[in-house]
Amino acid sequence: MGQLLSTEATTSIPSLRNAFFVGDILTKRDCLRLQSLASNVRIINMYGTTETQRAVSYFPIPPVSEDPVFLNGQKDIIPAGRGMKDVQLLVVNRTDKNIVCGIGELGELFVRAAGLAEGYLRLPDLTEQKFLMNWMNHSLPNQSILENGNSTAQWKAYYFGPRDRLYRTGDLGRYLPNGDGII
């Protein structure tokens, strides 16, 4: 998508059906430009970091051929959307992380998802600062399965036990009234 937008492309691309955007802020201007070249394209805005190892949210923009006025209702910055399946985007108060921000309130973004990186190689202090146990969940599963099972099972050396971790992204975000997030 970036290459199409950065060049002076003028040729229509009616066969383009999907364009995925991740890694930067997506603007309404860029979406309108792409849709002017490809009226059948569905643009999917996504958010993800190296530490989450994948995109963790999505916001679909329908093709202009299906909904010609959809972008008229959007602000200049396209939302990051909602967490994908089994992903939670938490926006918390910057001074008290025990308070989840209300709609429209700016806060720090945390990601709760399976597949978070274990941490940063040879940077234990940064790992401790950015990868946190979920302080909001007090009901982790019972450890007795590990304690009562076969103590020589080889897999136990690689199993970290039941965990509920959050990644502190360092990004600021807020919730929209419909539940989508803006980063």
What are these regions (language model features)?
Residues M1-A9, N18-R42, A55, D86:
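Short gly/Ser/Thr-rich phosphate-binding loop of adenylate-forming enzymes
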Residues T27-K28, S36-N45, S57-I183:
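AMP-dependent adenylate-forming
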